[in-house]
Design a protein with these regions (language model features):
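Surface-exposed repetitive/solenoidal architectures
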Residues: 7, 12-214
């Protein structure tokens, strides 16, 4: 069993990693390298699984999914980590994924991320619409102008974060900064999850959500 571990905490749910053969039988596309991971942008509705830790040190990351072309697929981290994600942008929708709609991210660590954007900035995704994060953790520093979160910048329309943990430090120059999500709204939920990073901003700041609008 591989347990997703932050610096201080083991996520409650444990992962029994799938083998290559099992993953292929379940219809997954195998991800083993940074180039494999970046290639997700060529099929945003695909079903993907990590088969190794991926170090993005030195990689000029192109955010996967945008407002007009969202990531709608699935990424199963399989208990592995994506480390050293680096983004320094003045644009909205920044993170490993920029914009997710109807997507699912599970069993994944985003470790040591350094993400800078404008609005809708997160370690995992900038914007989540009707999407799910389950059994994940994040560490690093996430910063921008507004709607900044350790996992998700803006989580809306029945999106969910469950059984997850963030130790990312979050900094908003203005408003809505949260340890897990900057703004949680429109029937979106956070369950069995916690954060243990520093959160800074001028207005609407929270350990889990900067603003929880229901």
């Amino acid at each position: 069993l591989r347990c997703l571990v932050g610096s201080e905490m083991c996520i409650r749910d444990r992962v029994e990693p799938l083998t290559n053969e099992e993953a292929l039988a379940e219809g997954y596309t195998i991800i083993k390298s940074a180039s494999d991971l970046q290639a997700i942008q060529n099929d945003l509705d695909g079903k993907y699984i990590l088969m190794d830790n991926i170090d993005l040190s030195g990689v000029s990351w192109n955010v996967i999914g945008s407002l007009n072309n969202a990531f709608t697929g699935e990424l199963n981290g399989n208990g592995y980590a994506i480390s050293n994600l680096y983004i320094n942008s003045g644009d909205d929708y920044q993170g490993l994924f920029g914009y997710m709609e109807g997507a699912k991210i599970s069993n994944l660590a985003v470790d040591g991320a350094n993400v800078v954007g404008r609005r809708y900035v997160g370690g995992v995704a900038g914007y989540s619409y009707d999407s799910e994060i389950y059994n994940c953790y994040s560490t690093g520093v996430i910063s921008g102008y507004s709607d900044i979160g350790g996992f998700i910048g803006y989580s809306t329309h029945y999106s969910s974060i469950a059984s997850s943990y963030s130790k990312a430090d979050v900094v908003a120059q203005e408003y809505r900064a949260g340890g897990l999500v900057g703004c949680n709204t429109d029937n979106s939920t956070i369950t069995d999850s916690l954060s243990h990073g520093d959160v800074e901003g001028n207005l609407n700041i929270g350990g889990l959500a900067g603003e929880n609008a229901g």
